[in-house]
Amino acid sequence: LPDKEGGKVLNDPYFWFLLVSLVGLLGFVSIISLNTGLNHDELEHVHSAWYVANGFLPYGDFFQNHNPLIWYICAPLLGFLGETAASILAMRVICLFFMLGSLAVSLLITRRLTSSLPAGIVSLLLLLTSSFFLASAYQIRPDVPQVFFGLWGVYFLLLFIEKSSGARAVLSGMSLALSFLFLQKAVFLIGAAGLVFVFFNFRDRLPFRYLLLFGVSFAAPILAFLAVLFFNGLIEDYYITNYLVNLNRIRTFSPLRTISRFADRDYLFLIFALFSLPVLLLARGSDRKTGSLAFITLLMVFSIRFHDRPHSQNFLPMLPLLAIGLSVFLHRFFERFKTPAPAKILIMLLLIGIPFRNVLPKLHSSNRPRLEAIMHVVENTGPNDPVYDGNIKFNVYRPDLHYFWYSVNRGKLLDSYNRVTGNRFGKYDIYDLIFTRKPKFISLFDIDREDPRFEKLMRMYSSTPYLDIHRLNKEK
């Protein structure tokens, strides 16, 4: 797609400022993605990939409340690299590539709306300096590929609005379906994009085959997934763990708590991005593609109120859309007022420089202590030795004591599961499990220290040099 500016962009100091900033930030993010400390959510998905690699089935053999595609993508790495720290870092690299892919699609969308390469780069800089985006954008979690495929769904939708074709309808529907197969929360983007697709089909009186192609291409991957669940006898378990449990959480919190953190860290980005959306949607002369993007983004913003535990990763799908909207707004603002390069550079320094201060502390974070603890457990256990690690801090390559291996503390997913299953695991007792199976390593997470059995437990286990990892004493 050619730039309106043509060759002039190469003589523009503003363009070179943007390009140098982009290269520097991409290098910075690549470094921190390999070194930043590992989140326990990440280890949850590493452990699930290990289960899958060893022939266990999610939902039936071990508890999970996410869609499964990321584990099946990561599992082959364990065959190549083994139960090593390198496998975990390789999974980080995969998610880094998904993040870079999301940036590339954001660039494509912005250029499609503006015919401007500098505007496309602006959308990337806004994301790469957002501490909220970088809090989870390269982590080992299904949210990351969910965003990648969701953005492709939006891109092909905008192409369809520009010029309808069956191929564009199919690619949009299939991309949105793949986004869902990584994470159920994609339903919010799917709903928003689906509304726009249906609206333009009826408004422009397009042939019914486009709706059919979009619907079939969206439904086919999901039906294939459901067929796999059915033939493995997992439909009921999947419905319970991924829907009933998630919809009946006991511990919830208001979106305002997370939004206030977002506003505190990235307030300039948030304020100007939210201001730009109604302008792009309602301004005279706003084209259909830009209005559609603004509408989808506004619906994504409003969808946050339907999240019962909106952590920073729940904002990931909307952040690229907000960045694209703001970059389109800035591009039109600069064009309308014929803003000189020094003024544009100053505005961008404010927009990306202030929030970047909150990203710099990531340079001092290290994943080495966590990886050393993980490998200590691996090196001192056999392949079939169970481990208790209820908070997912060190056990990623060994079996657990129970079907429910995380979120076992009061008010969390185990209690939600028991609520919707007639107390199926109501007799869950971590003391009984430990005394019966005698795992070589345990955590004291969610172990009642007031329980009279705690003293016996402490006679059985001794502390290690690693935080909250206790090793079974040798029998005398």
Predicted regions and their residues:
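Hydrophobic/aromatic-rich transmembrane helices and adjacent perimembrane loops
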Residues: S136, D143, L151, F188, ...
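Hydrophobic, aromatic-rich transmembrane alpha-helices
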Residues: A104, D266-V301
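Extracytoplasmic
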Residues: K185-A186, N232, L350-K476
